[in-house]
Amino acid sequence: MSVSQAMRRLVAATVVAGSCAGPAQAAGGAPQDLPSVVPESAGVDSAPLVRLSEWLRHDRMDVRSLVVVKDGKIVFERYGDGLTRDNNYELYSVTKTITALLAGILDGEGKLGPSTKVAPLIAAARPDLASELADKQDIELRHLMSMSSGLRYTTREGTDPLYYDAPDRLRVAVTSRAAQPPGTHFDYIDVNPVLVGTAVSIAAQVPEDAFARQRLFEPLGFAHYRWSGADGTGAVAGGWGLRLRAVDMAKIGMLLLDNGRWNGRQIVPAGWIRQMTTPSPAADDYGYYCWIHHVVEHGTPEFGAMGFKGQFITVLPAQRAVVVMTSLLPTDGGLRDATYLNLYRRMVGDYILPALTPARPPVESAAATQALRDELARSRQTKGVPGTAAAFNDAPEI
């Protein structure tokens, strides 16, 4: 089958997928969630977690969900403003990490790889864009995923056609211009994941969101998920728009922690996970759509995903732990020092890590368990104050 024929099949599949899009359950008909346990039974001290929740509640931070997993078990699951486990949230750039995992699945099948030249692949599927892709022939998949493509794109705040009501997002993305040699300069721009998501769809011969459902979301037992923001062609963006429950975000963290394995099954090649979580030549804190040593200081190994306004999946390998947060926190500051990032750094460094690494083995007690239960109940009844303006996509859904 030619690439152009594959693209025609892909467009047809996109229409079909769009007609049945919506929240989904696991193949067995019910979500397969991680087990929940009393923190002390997993060697975790609940007292710092109670203090963390009290701080968030006292300062009325708009933290919608905060989940801590230790050794594959949920030890802390906090929701605000009446929200529950069933709610999903706009993940913003955490979506990019999912796209990298999908590329890894295709790498394991020999359909994509770090050195794949993306422009020729797209041009063969979209001949109408060949002229715009002519200056991008040397850009490889790894350059796009490490934000070192060398492309330059100027975003029009609030009205950019890459984000808002795009009739054909890919057509907008390819108008970016090659400004630096690929692999030499880090520049965090959102045309990169649009190109990667397109490559994933072409290589998989189904739309990216359908491939994600088949090869990642259903095997991990996701529920109540949605990939929003499709453009006029029906294609989702590879860098934003995915909505997941916090407990399903935690499963992504566990997949990364366990080198691509889930319940004994290799979902993503282990070698790909290692590449994702290894710094690229262009940035010592960024791999394949994965931040590295970005949250925790003092040399503690850590990597994960970060999204605008305070969406996080953080993996702590030494503690065999995963931390997840969804929020609407202040966005002032830069990519590496945003207020939401600094607040999250304090949460992890001052409260969560001490809970995971107590000075002495914690003792399970009825009093400690009740104190945690009471604080979580108070948190669910507390409405946080948004730290930044809420957009149309920021409302939690079910």
Each language-model region and where it sits:
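Bacterial N-terminal signal peptides
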Residues: 11-21
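Short, charged, amphipathic alpha-helices and their helix-cap/turn boundaries
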Residues: 47, 73-78, 117-120, 157-182, ...
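A short, well-structured edge-of-sheet supersecondary motif
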Residues: 53-84, 313-314, 320-324
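Active-site SXXK
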Residues: 72, 89-118, 144, 196-200, ...
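Active-site helix/loop module of the DD-peptidase/beta-lactamase fold
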Residues: 90, 109-151, 175, 204-240
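Active-site-proximal alpha-helical segments within enzyme catalytic domains
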Residues: 192-199, 240-261, 311-328
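Short, gly/Ser/Thr-rich active-site loops of penicillin-recognizing serine hydrolases
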Residues: 334-398
